[in-house]
């Protein structure tokens, strides 16, 4: 202990005479008188008592003796009720005494000024954070963000190679592949294509209806795109593949009997292959084309834009295509090509899912040519919209 005291000298002596006197006598140390001109003594000057304080000074002691178990707050309530119950004549002596004390206080302390004590504020639980600390932590977080985004993009690229797609997680990567032009280079899109918009925005800019369709991914891509290494993909709703006769002029029509499509379930859009590139072999599936469908071009109703279709039906539709591909088309042709056969309509429904329009709405040759021209123009517009 002595070595510690020697190593750390104290500016003041450790001896405290007041503490020694208290310990020796067992009594409180005597109060040290202060000079009247001292500022500390003026700050401790008490206010003169009013009439209630003069009366309650003795009355509180009497109630405390009578009710020793009562709290001081309860005693104050009782004193307040008793003071209000007193009459003016009973309060008169206490009012006079308070006036005398006030005059005496003015003589003793002519320069007295009332300084109310500040209430002790509770210590704040949360302290102010240093702005430098916030800036440093923010910079560290921003430096870590590109690494996380690049790592997550690499994982998404592996999922794309394996054919695994999630509508929620694959959207940023697919958006980067779609919006990037052919000059983006081979392979997948770079992270810059995804991070071009600020992350403070709730939604990325340049949103279009095609962006909503991109998580479902295209199932039929042109081989020339893979050969040239262009990452651009043409999004469309998943559905059955089509034969080359219908690929240049895909049509989607609406009929009073329901929505009719060529070789697929109602409500699914169609797409033509990219010009200048040979279409994928999946377009030549024999199970989805039949000569009876050639009549549909002559009987078209009001055209409507292709509606959205949920992506989770794509696998079911592909499995149905594979099952139909295993069947022999000649078995259907010998029944469906027979004129006047009662099962021809039933066979058409089993193959395409709807009744042939030729049995419902016969039309003339002039109307047929006009509707065909309008249908081709509308199909060309929709194809250009989906490609762009």
Curated annotation (Swiss-Prot):
SMART domains for the chain: HMG
Residue ranges of the DNA-binding region?
45-113
Q: Where is the Sox C-terminal domain?
A: 268-388
Tissues where this protein is expressed: Widely expressed in adult and fetal tissues. Present both in mesenchymal and epithelial cells in some adult tissues, including colon. Tends to be down-regulated in prostate adenocarcinomas and colorectal tumors due to promoter hypermethylation.
The Basic and acidic residues compositionally biased stretches are: 36-45, 146-164
State where it is primarily located.
nucleus
- Output this protein's name: Transcription factor SOX-7
Which species expresses this protein natively? Homo sapiens (Human)
Q: What taxonomic classification does the UniProt entry list for its organism?
A: Eukaryota, Metazoa, Chordata, Craniata, Vertebrata
Which gene is transcribed and translated to give this protein? SOX7
């Amino acid at each position: 202990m002595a070595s510690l005291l020697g190593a750390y000298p104290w500016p003041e002596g450790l001896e405290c005479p007041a503490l020694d006197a208290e310990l020796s006598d067992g009594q409180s140390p005597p109060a040290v008188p202060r000079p009247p001109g001292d500022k500390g003594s003026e700050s401790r000057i008490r206010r003169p008592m009013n009439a209630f304080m003069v009366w309650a000074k003795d009355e509180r002691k009497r109630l405390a003796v009578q009710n020793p178990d009562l709290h001081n707050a309860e005693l104050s309530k009782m004193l307040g009720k008793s003071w209000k119950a007193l009459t003016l004549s009973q309060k008169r002596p206490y009012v006079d005494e308070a006036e005398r004390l006030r005059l005496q206080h003015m003589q003793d302390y002519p320069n007295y000024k009332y300084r109310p004590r500040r209430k002790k504020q509770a210590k704040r639980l949360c302290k102010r954070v240093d702005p430098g600390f916030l800036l440093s932590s923010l910079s560290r977080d921003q430096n870590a963000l590109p690494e996380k985004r690049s790592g997550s993009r690499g994982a998404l690229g592996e999922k794309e190679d394996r054919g695994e797609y999630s509508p929620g997680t694959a959207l940023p990567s697919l958006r980067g592949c779609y919006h990037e032009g052919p000059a983006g280079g081979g392979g997948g899109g770079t992270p810059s294509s995804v991070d071009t918009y600020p992350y403070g925005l709730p939604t990325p800019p340049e949103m279009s209806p095609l962006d909503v369709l991109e998580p479902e991914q295209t199932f039929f891509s042109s081989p020339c795109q893979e050969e040239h290494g262009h990452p651009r993909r043409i999004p469309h709703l998943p559905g059955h593949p089509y034969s080359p006769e219908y690929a240049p002029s895909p049509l989607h029509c609406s009929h009073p009997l329901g929505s009719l499509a060529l070789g697929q379930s109602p409500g699914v859009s169609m797409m033509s292959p990219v010009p200048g590139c040979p279409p994928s072999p999946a377009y030549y599936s024999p199970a989805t084309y039949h000569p009876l469908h050639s009549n549909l071009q002559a009987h078209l109703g009001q055209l409507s834009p292709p509606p959205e279709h949920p992506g989770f039906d794509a696998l079911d539709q592909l499995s149905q295509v594979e099952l139909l591909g295993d069947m022999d088309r000649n078995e259907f042709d010998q029944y469906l090509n027979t004129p006047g056969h009662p099962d021809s309509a039933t066979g058409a429904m089993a193959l395409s899912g709807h009744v042939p329009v030729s049995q419902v709405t016969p039309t003339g040759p002039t109307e047929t040519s006009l509707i065909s021209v309008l249908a081709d123009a509308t199909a060309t517009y929709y194809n250009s919209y989906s490609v762009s």
